[in-house]
Amino acid sequence: MKYNNQIFLDEFKNKMLEINPQKVLFVCSKDYDRYGYRKALDEISIKSVSFTSFEPCPEVSSVENGIEAYKANECDFVVAVGGGSAIDTAKGIKFYSKLDFDILAVPTTAG
């Protein structure tokens, strides 16, 4: 089976255009640029910032730092790209911030 990343990125761009956020907080690993998500948002003129300061089995302090990044950068949407740690951190940011925003999770692992 061959995976076509461009097809997925096109679907991602279409979904983001539908959602139409002003600024996205990416919760992701430090090397997430290799997946092409930032470039995809740049192509459709949606601003984004990265939050990479979390560890496996995220601590509450990481979630608090994520909330700070979300607020300081005036984000209105979160995209979690990666495995369980990124997705769990994004869920923690939403839950503990008590702010009204949605999350889009993009798992990069399987199994």
Language model region names:
Residues 1-77:
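ATP/NTP phosphate-donor binding region
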Residues 60-111:
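Glycine/threonine-rich beta-strand-loop-alpha-helix active-site module
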